Amino acid sequence: MNKTTLLYTGKAKQVYATDDPDVLWMAYTNQATALNGEKKAQIAHKGELNRAISTLLFKELTAAGIPTHYLDSPDSTTMIVKKAAMLPLEVVVRNYASGHFVTKFNVKPMMKLDPPIHEYYYKSDELGDPFMNEAQIFALHEATPEQLKQVHALTDRINTYLTQRFAAIGITLVDFKLEYGTLKDGTLVLADELSPDNFRLVDQQTGASLDKDVFRQNRGPLTPVYEEVLSRLQEKGAAHV
C-alpha cells in the first residue's frame, strides 16, 4: 500500500489517496489546536499517541460489531482506512455537563445528564461549526432520516461501550465528538479518530483533565497526559468492559 496525492490537511491529520481507490492513508501529526484553530502548537509524540489510542479503540469497536473505517496501522503515525464520503456533521455526546453547556444552561459542572445528550454541529471552520437540529439537517440535505437514525443508534452503542471502557480504567467520559461517513456501497461507518483530542476525560480519583483541555487551558504539558490515557487502556484491555 503506497500513498499518492495529498487530499486534505486538517488540524491534526493529513489524508492521502493510495494506489487503491477505495483506501485512504491517514497521517497523524503533532499539531495541537484549540479555540477553532486560533491556538496552535507542536506537541512532541502527539501524533503517535493519538494514532495508538485511535487504533486501539477502533479495533475494539470493530470487534464489538460497530462498523468503522479502520483497516490497518502500518507505522506509528499512520492509519489505513476505508474511503468514506463524510457526513458534514460533528456528533457530540454529552454524559456530564461541561464546557459551554454549563454556561449556556447555567447548570452545575459535572452534573450527570440522563439520558445522555446527542448534539449535531455543521462541520465548517468558516462558519464556526454551528449547531444544527434534525429539521435543518434534513432541509439542507446533509443527511437522510435513515442515516440520522443509524447515526443515533450507533452513537448510543459507542457511548455505552466507551463509557464502560474508560470507567474500568478510572476515567469518566464526560463528552466526546464522533464523525461518520458512507462507503461506496452505502454502509454507514464510524470514521475520523478516537482520541483525547475529541474526548473530554476526567480522572475519577483526582478530577484532573486527561484530554486536550490541558493544552486549551494552559494546565501543563500535554504529552504525559496522553501517555497516561494510552497506558491505562493498554494495561486493562477490552475484556474488562
From Swiss-Prot:
GO BP terms: 'de novo' IMP biosynthetic process; cobalamin biosynthetic process
Pathway stated in the Swiss-Prot or TrEMBL entry: Purine metabolism; IMP biosynthesis via de novo pathway; 5-amino-1-(5-phospho-D-ribosyl)imidazole-4-carboxamide from 5-amino-1-(5-phospho-D-ribosyl)imidazole-4-carboxylate: step 1/2
Signal peptide from the UniProt entry: none
Pfam family, one: SAICAR_synt
Keyword Nucleotide-binding: yes
EC number: 6.3.2.6
InterPro entries per UniProt: SAICAR_synt/ADE2_N (IPR028923), SAICAR_synt_PurC (IPR033934), SAICAR_synth (IPR001636), SAICAR_synthetase (IPR050089)
Keyword terms, alphabetized: ATP-binding, Ligase, Nucleotide-binding, Purine biosynthesis
Gene Ontology terms for molecular function: ATP binding; phosphoribosylaminoimidazolesuccinocarboxamide synthase activity
Reactions this protein catalyses: 5-amino-1-(5-phospho-D-ribosyl)imidazole-4-carboxylate + L-aspartate + ATP = (2S)-2-[5-amino-1-(5-phospho-beta-D-ribosyl)imidazole-4-carboxamido]succinate + ADP + phosphate + 2 H(+)
HAMAP family per UniProt: SAICAR_synth (MF_00137)
Matching PANTHER family: MULTIFUNCTIONAL PROTEIN ADE2, SI:DKEY-6E2.2
Similarity section: Belongs to the SAICAR synthetase family.
Protein name: Phosphoribosylaminoimidazole-succinocarboxamide synthase
Underlying gene: purC
